[in-house]
């Protein structure tokens, strides 16, 4: 009789946007950033949208013109609530924006840098290798893996969730992602 296997799936949040935020020493969770080539038309597809910018109703694969439209719409609403209906400045940080209604929502457009994303992906893969043998790591994409942890749970005396969280924390501590 075959024993059931245990797998974990790790999908890094808004990976390209997170890399671009870390490269700018910014918080990937609070920085409004899209990865897109602004030299193309506004119809270009964004390769990634940061979590804080998604809160304005954007999908992860929005077109640049949609980002512009959604942010403009959100700014129109904010302006009504701003003192004297005038913005004092702008910010691309969701924490600052939440604290100060007189700030205009801004965002960073980061041109794609695939080679840099591959470097981060390699660093992250090497972190997985600290815990798991390569034959048990199944790469799905640049930022997603499925890992067979069946034989590691007793070794580490952890649940699958605990092992996943240990690896994720190591990734965060090492890369900021």
Regions found by a protein language model. Give the residues of each.
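Residues that scaffold, gate, or flank divalent-cation-dependent active/transport sites
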Residues: 1-153, 160-161, 165-175
């Amino acid at each position: 009789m075959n024993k059931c296997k245990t797998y974990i799936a790790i999908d890094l949040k808004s990976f390209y946007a997170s890399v671009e935020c870390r490269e700018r020493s910014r918080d990937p969770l609070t920085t409004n950033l899209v990865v897109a080539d602004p030299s193309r038309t506004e119809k270009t597809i964004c390769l990634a949208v940061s979590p804080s910018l998604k809160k304005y109703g954007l999908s992860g694969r929005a077109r640049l013109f949609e980002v512009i439209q959604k942010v403009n719409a959100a700014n129109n609403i904010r302006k009504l609530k701003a003192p004297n209906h005038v913005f004092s400045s702008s910010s691309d940080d969701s924490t600052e924006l939440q604290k100060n209604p007189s700030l205009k929502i801004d965002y960073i457009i980061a041109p794609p840098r695939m080679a840099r994303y591959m470097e981060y992906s390699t660093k992250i893969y090497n972190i997985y290798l600290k815990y798991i043998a390569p034959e048990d790591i199944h790469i799905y994409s640049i930022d997603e893996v499925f890992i067979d942890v069946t034989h590691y749970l007793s070794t580490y005396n952890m649940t699958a969730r605990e092992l996943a969280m240990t690896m994720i924390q190591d990734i965060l501590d090492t890369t900021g992602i």
